Structure formats: C-alpha cells, structure tokens
A protein has these predicted regions:
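Surface "functional belts" at beta-alpha junctions
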Residues: 20-27, 31, 36-37, 91-186, ...
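DPxDG-like acidic metal-binding loop motif
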Residues: 61-92
Length: 230
C-alpha cells in the first residue's frame, strides 16, 4: 500500500493506493480545507488507513508533493510526510507540483504555470517528462517566456490566468495555442506519477529533503529563455 499527500494548493488531498501491474489502483481518497491542514492532516491519514483496515505498517512508501505553492501548506505536508517516514521507517518520494501539472497535460513540451500571488507565477519547463528548469516569474516574464520561438504549450491549473492570457496571440509555433487548463493534480495523481520511481526503488532521504518553494530568479533558468550559443 502507498500513501500520498498534496498540501500545496487551496485544498489538501490524501490518497491510498496499491501497485497494480504497470499502474496504481486507488483505494481511498480524502480532501481537507486549507484552514484545517495542520490540525486535521494526521487524523485524516489515520481515518483513511482505518477505512481500509490498515495501519502505517502496511504502507510501503509515502509520496509527498513538496511544492511549489502555499508556504504553510508545503511545510505542513512535508513535515508530516518526513515525520511518518522517519518514525515508521517508510521510504519517501517527493514530486514537484509543476511536474504533476505537466504530466497531466499529456503533451510533450510544456510550460506549467501556477499562480504564486501578487501577479507572479511558478513556471516549470518540461520536455518529455524531463525537468528543464523551474522558476518564479512575474506575469510579464511568464508571457515573454511563453511566446519565445519553440516554447511549449502553456498549462495552468487552478491559477488565475489573466496575466498570461496575452500568450494566446503569439503562439503560432505551438501545436495547441494558448493556455491549456488542467484539473489541479491531487494526491491520487501524485501517487500514479510516483509509481515509476517506486518500482525502481528511487527514494528521497527525509533528512536532506527540502521544500520546493521557488524563489525569485533569472528567467534564463528555463532552457528556452537562454541565449542561443554562437
């Protein structure tokens, strides 16, 4: 059995699943309101396990979405996942919220964008699942990056897309023009996304795993925004 937590967005989600051949079978899920994260997360995990007549001893791995997103939500989710992993000796897998968003689009080249507030966006560039860079950008910088020649499809989740909508007028190189809205990935999506690493035994060290907050940085962190080599 596997346990997944996602506390990065406006709601938190928990999922239980089991490996099923090449996929994962979701057994149970639960959602929490943002204001109840710190008080309700562990009790909800216990209740979800109890609903399947299971305990932490039955959990083979814990998957946690470690950001970017709500600083408070990330801290609560990550500290809970790390505490359970260390306390019960359970392997831990951390996944990026932007990577989940890119994967959910089912497109090969993606700019995944999540509203960071104050007209800023968390933006990640992914090519065939490979992380080419993640950065915190202003709305204007996001538009500039999204309209570069060869830019991937701009994908937004529950975010406000007002600041990035101008990209729709300059995406002639894209197979699909403009923002593609994807259902915000929940813990069940994170669980399925992490199955490849679970089967390969690729786990994170709880002692060294950090939150993926994403600070202000140069837009050239993204591959497509870097000057071409001469």
């Amino acid at each position: 059995m596997l346990l997944a937590l996602n506390t990065c967005g406006s709601t938190a989600s928990i999922a239980l699943g089991v490996a099923d051949k090449d996929d994962v079978k979701i057994l149970a899920t639960a959602e929490l309101a943002v204001r109840t994260y710190s008080a309700r997360l562990i009790p909800e995990i216990a209740a979800l396990l109890e609903s399947r007549q299971a305990t932490l001893r039955d959990v083979e791995a814990i998957v946690v979405v470690n950001g970017p997103g709500s600083f408070t939500g990330i801290r609560v989710g990550l500290s809970t996942a790390k505490g359970l992993a260390e306390g019960a000796g359970i392997p831990l897998i951390a996944v990026s919220r932007l990577a989940l968003l890119a994967a959910a689009s089912l497109l090969p080249h993606v700019l995944a964008a999540v509203d960071a507030g104050r007209s800023e966006y968390y933006v990640g560039e992914y090519l065939n699942g490979e992380n080419l860079g993640e950065v915190l950008l202003s709305g204007e910088e996001t538009v500039a990056v999204a309209t570069q020649p060869g830019a991937g499809v701009l994908v937004c989740d529950e975010s406000r897309a007002d600041d990035v909508s101008p990209a729709t007028s300059a995406c002639s190189a894209l197979a699909i023009c403009g923002p593609v809205y994807v259902q915000p990935p929940d813990a069940a999506v994170a669980l399925a996304f992490a199955m490849k690493r679970f089967r390969a035994g690729q786990f994170d060290d709880p002692e060294t795993l950090n939150a993926n907050y994403l600070r202000r940085s140069d837009a050239e962190v993204l591959r497509l925004a870097r000057p071409a080599a001469k």
